[in-house]
């Protein structure tokens, strides 16, 4: 699958992509094409902001930093909005979503690209940061309750692993971005599928 990542934000982002792609700077209006093989799983694309890197590609980002390197090999640090995917899985389908489980830094859309007969995908185009609850504000953006409070009921682990429900915080995020994962058991309204072989477009600030 080809993923076209487009920065429509009025500022520079440093796009990141694992396990394929790594990372690169995207000025306003620039795009980046990433080819991911069928069978790729646990994949993420995200935007890093406020980055400074030296000529060797080392430095740091205010949001989404992945260990201080331009070329990410591991996931980014919360808070950051995530575009997630797994290719050619059950029933020959691709599964994809936008997650704000790790918080929110930049609005995204994640849509099928081209004429595969598949047209639905998630959009989280609202600036969640503008109305972020004060206790979730971090680095000028909006974190989720799980990374902030590390409690079972927010993270759906431990005592809440099998009995996890929306919280006031996840309902806030869901109200802002109905398509996005707002808490870990939010699968029903947040996972999208297309036939394997579909190409996709991820737009920052759609």
Swiss-Prot record:
PROSITE patterns from the UniProt entry: THAUMATIN_1, THAUMATIN_2
InterPro entries with a match to the protein in the record: Osmotin/thaumatin-like_sf, Thaumatin, Thaumatin_CS
Keyword line: Antimicrobial, Disulfide bond, Fungicide, Plant defense, Protease inhibitor, Serine protease inhibitor
Any GO BP annotation: killing of cells of another organism
Keyword hit for Disulfide bond: yes
Origin: domain of life: Eukaryota
GO molecular function: serine-type endopeptidase inhibitor activity
Paired cysteines (S-S): 9-205, 51-61, 66-72, 118-194, 124-177, 132-142, 146-155, 156-164
Protein role: Inhibits both trypsin and alpha-amylase. Inhibits the growth of some plant fungal pathogens.
Similarity section: Belongs to the thaumatin family.
Name of the protein this chain belongs to: Alpha-amylase/trypsin inhibitor
Organism of derivation: Zea mays
């Amino acid at each position: 699958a080809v993923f076209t990542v487009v920065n429509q934000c009025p500022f520079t982002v440093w796009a990141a992509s694992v396990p394929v792609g790594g990372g690169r700077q995207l000025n306003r209006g620039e795009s980046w094409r990433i080819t991911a093989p069928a069978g790729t799983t646990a994949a993420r694309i995200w935007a890093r902001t406020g980055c400074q890197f030296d000529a060797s590609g080392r430095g740091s980002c205010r949001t989404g930093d992945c260990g201080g390197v331009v070329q990410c090999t591991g996931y980014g640090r919360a808070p950051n909005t995530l575009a997630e995917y797994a290719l050619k899985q059950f029933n020959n389908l691709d599964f994809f979503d936008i997650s704000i489980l790790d918080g929110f830094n930049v609005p995204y859309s994640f849509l099928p690209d081209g004429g595969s007969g598949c047209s639905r995908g998630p959009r989280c185009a609202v600036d969640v940061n503008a109305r972020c609850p004060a206790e979730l504000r971090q680095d000028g953006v909006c974190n989720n309750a799980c990374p902030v409070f590390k409690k079972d009921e927010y993270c759906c682990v431990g005592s809440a692993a099998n009995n996890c429900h929306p919280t006031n915080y996840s309902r806030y995020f869901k109200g802002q971005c109905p398509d996005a994962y707002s808490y870990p058991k939010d699968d029903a309204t947040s996972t999208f599928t297309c036939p394997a072989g579909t190409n996709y477009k991820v737009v920052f600030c759609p």
